[in-house]
């Protein structure tokens, strides 16, 4: 099953070991929101319940690595565009951007859907 854009962001955040609180503690909102409200907002983003502004994507990417091209492709697929699914690790959702933001080389895959970082950790 293909990931939604929000599920992709959630997977990348958790692959980096960051909690909702870790991320929202350093993201400012306008208008200002409490930490609890920001946590709920991030959960809604990850559940694809709210639209995400470009400034939010930039702020999230400063907190954990993810591939903008993958996020865009998943968004287009979700909107009905007929595109092939991006190659993603089934555990950390790495593509060209690995679990720690490092490039995954062509030989960096243990299986078609499993990067060697996650294969070694299993």
Each language-model region and where it sits:
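A short, Lys/Arg-rich alpha-helix, primarily the initiator
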Residues: 1-22, 26
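Residues in the helix-turn-helix
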Residues: 22, 41, 70
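Phosphate-coordinating loops and pocket residues in cytosolic domains that bind phosphorylated ligands
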Residues: 25, 44, 73-76
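Recognition helix of helix-turn-helix/homeodomain-like DNA-binding domains
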Residues: 27-52
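Cys/His-rich microdomains that often coordinate metals
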Residues: 49, 91, 96, 119-122
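DNA major-groove recognition helix of helix-turn-helix/homeodomain DNA-binding modules
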Residues: 50-72
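Short, charged recognition helix plus adjacent turn
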Residues: 69-98, 108
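Cysteine-rich micro-motifs
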Residues: 100-122
């Amino acid at each position: 099953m293909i990931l939604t854009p929000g599920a992709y962001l959630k997977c990348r955040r958790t692959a980096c070991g960051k909690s909702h609180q870790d991320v929202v503690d350093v993201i400012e909102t306008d208008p200002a929101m409490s930490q609890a409200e920001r946590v709920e907002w991030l959960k809604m983003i990850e559940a694809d319940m709210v639209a995400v502004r470009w400034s939010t994507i930039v702020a999230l990417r400063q907190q954990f690595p993810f591939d903008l091209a993958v996020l865009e492709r998943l968004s287009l697929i979700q909107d009905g565009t007929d595109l092939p699914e991006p190659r993603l690790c089934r555990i950390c959702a790495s593509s060209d951007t690995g679990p720690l933001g490092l490039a995954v080389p062509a030989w960096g895959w243990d299986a078609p859907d499993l990067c060697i970082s996650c294969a070694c950790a299993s």
